[in-house]
């Protein structure tokens, strides 16, 4: 079984994906981490994030063992990741990796922005997570401060709105819900409530409802 979870930045899809995978004993892939890893590689090399050729080279040399690096969660890396993820050749370079991950039995949960529309259009269950931008900014600010980073909620909100605009309007794999996706509004749900709502969606699909 393949469960695709999509949604904008800081909507809670990553936490939901991880918890849902644990519930069903499936593998989990936060596909945003892949693009963040490419972004970090470019930043570490002092390369121009706008250079698509360099971004493709970084994508082809990714080391999955480094996907847990704490630096991948910084706002700077996130901003560059949003830029490189818009490059068609970068997305193509990472497509095979993601599809092979999804195909591994007994099942997988992948979260990102184009899982249900591009990466796994035949996914058994598709969930599109949404949340109010102000709520998302507050969550992202608290996450940053919990890591000891300085964060201004107004600045974070502006960045989120900018990323939403870029993600929704990019020509390749724009952020949008698949036609058969189940929309889950996460604005007023805590982690447990969000998980229960997602499980209800999965079970309804499995039961053919």
Curated annotation (Swiss-Prot):
Keyword ATP-binding: yes
Binding site for ATP: 7-15
Keywords: ATP-binding, Cytoplasm, Kinase, Nucleotide-binding, Transferase
Catalytic activity: CMP + ATP = CDP + ADP; dCMP + ATP = dCDP + ADP
Keyword Cytoplasm: yes
Similarity comment: Belongs to the cytidylate kinase family. Type 1 subfamily.
Name this polypeptide is given: Cytidylate kinase
Gene: cmk
């Amino acid at each position: 079984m393949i469960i695709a979870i999509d949604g904008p930045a800081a909507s809670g899809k990553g936490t939901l994906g991880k918890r849902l995978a644990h519930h069903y004993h499936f593998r989990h892939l936060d596909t945003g981490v892949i693009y963040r890893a490419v972004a970090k590689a470019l930043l570490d090399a002092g390369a121009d994030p706008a250079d698509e050729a360099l971004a493709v080279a970084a994508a082809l040399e990714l080391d999955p063992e480094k996907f847990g690096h704490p630096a991948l969660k910084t706002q700077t890396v996130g901003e560059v990741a949003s830029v490189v993820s818009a490059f068609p050749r970068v997305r193509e370079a990472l497509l095979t990796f993601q599809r092979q991950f999804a195909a591994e039995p007994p099942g997988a949960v992948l979260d990102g922005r184009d899982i249900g529309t591009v990466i796994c259009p035949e996914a058994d269950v598709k969930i599109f997570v949404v949340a109010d931008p102000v709520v998302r900014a507050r969550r992202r600010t608290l996450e940053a401060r919990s890591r000891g980073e300085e964060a201004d909620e107004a600045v974070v909100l502006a960045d989120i709105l900018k990323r939403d605009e870029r993600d929704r309007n990019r020509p390749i794999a724009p952020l949008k819900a698949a036609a058969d996706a189940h929309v889950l509004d996460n604005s007023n749900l805590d982690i447990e409530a969000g998980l229960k709502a997602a499980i209800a969606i999965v079970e309804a699909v499995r039961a053919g409802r």
